[in-house]
């Protein structure tokens, strides 16, 4: 159990880290201009039969929850889909036509000088165009005819208002995973939406933390040591921790929340995996937003190790040992040159 003074010191360090890593105005402006350039390049074209469309933003950028080198998540939506109708094209029913559309759009982005070496990931669950923007150096992902990410923005805004500690926690947890290569869904890591849901779910169910230091340490302990991936899944709306039930795993587990419920089927209607992370999408109840995070167990092991390292550091401080100027350095200390270089590059864009 850490003393109040050491947790207050950790709390202040978390505030300082967030103040440094949080988006600056010129960074947001450069990203705004990038969106406009892409919109100008694609918005004037008719990518779908007999229907125009538009570029929309989603994810960490419009929510203001991104790190300096974070990629941009965009979607090109037809007017029909945007106005409440069905998609003009669906990858599941017409993969060939969908892939052709993405390839044509990627060629357009390269032709006008925006995209550097764009490529299409056609076989993903959500097909995308990936490229690096020539001007900013930022990585960009563009999907087509999928508004699920856009619809989540209202949820982010609501959570930011209800749980003000979320902003600081997101920055910390993202940085912890970025430094260990566990923050990208396409490599099996935890995506931004999953990270946010983990944090919000913890805040909703845990005892109210005294400060950010207490909250962060509790988060690391809960997901690193107490949360059983094989037995539990997370429901965001309404908030609950549910038991996974499958033919392989009869559940008798009870821990952490008085609102622990039991489910007889998985989020997507299929048998629950007893090795993966399951988080029910608050805006699409049959969608497991962490379904692609096959390395979730590695991420949770990182949380466990970070908790132990941080707890040892705090204990050493309490005992009067010299730990240096930073507590957080033991888990997120490192080379931040990539952030400095990216910020310098964006600051020079007129």
Feature annotation, model-predicted:
Residues 6-15, 201-350:
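Pol beta-like nucleotidyltransferase catalytic core
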């Amino acid at each position: 159990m850490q003393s109040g003074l050491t947790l207050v010191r950790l709390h202040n360090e978390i505030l300082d880290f967030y103040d440094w890593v949080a988006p600056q105005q010129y960074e947001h402006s450069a990203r705004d201009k990038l969106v406009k350039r892409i919109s100008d390049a694609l918005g004037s074209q008719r990518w779908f039969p007999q229907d125009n469309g538009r570029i929309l933003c989603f994810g960490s950028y419009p929510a203001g929850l991104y790190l300096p080198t974070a990629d941009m998540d965009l979607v090109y939506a037809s007017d029909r889909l945007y106005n409440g109708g069905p998609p003009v094209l669906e990858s599941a029913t017409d993969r060939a036509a969908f892939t052709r559309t993405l390839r044509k759009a990627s060629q357009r982005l390269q032709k006008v000088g925006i995209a550097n070496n764009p490529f299409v990931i056609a076989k993903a669950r959500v097909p995308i165009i990936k490229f690096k923007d020539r001007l900013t150096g930022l990585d960009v992902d563009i999907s087509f005819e999928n508004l699920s990410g856009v619809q989540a923005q209202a949820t982010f805004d609501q959570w930011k208002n209800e749980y003000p500690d979320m902003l600081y926690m997101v920055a910390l947890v993202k940085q912890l995973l970025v430094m260990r290569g566990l923050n990208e869904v396409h490599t099996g890591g935890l995506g931004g939406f999953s990270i946010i849901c983990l944090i919000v779910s913890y805040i909703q169910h845990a005892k109210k933390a005294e400060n950010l230091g207490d909250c962060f340490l509790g988060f690391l302990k809960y997901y690193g040591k107490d949360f059983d991936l094989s037995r539990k899944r997370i429901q965001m709306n309404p908030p609950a921790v549910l038991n996974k039930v499958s033919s392989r795993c009869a559940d008798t587990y009870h821990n952490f929340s008085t609102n622990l419920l039991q489910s007889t089927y998985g989020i997507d209607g299929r048998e629950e995996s007893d090795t993966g992370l399951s988080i029910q999408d608050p805006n699409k109840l049959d969608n497991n937003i962490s379904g692609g995070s096959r390395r979730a167990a590695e991420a949770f092991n990182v949380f466990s190790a970070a908790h132990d390292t941080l707890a040892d550091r705090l204990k050493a401080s309490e005992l009067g040992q010299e730990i240096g100027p930073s507590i957080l350095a033991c888990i997120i200390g490192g080379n931040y040159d990539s952030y400095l270089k990216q910020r310098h590059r964006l600051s020079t864009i007129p």
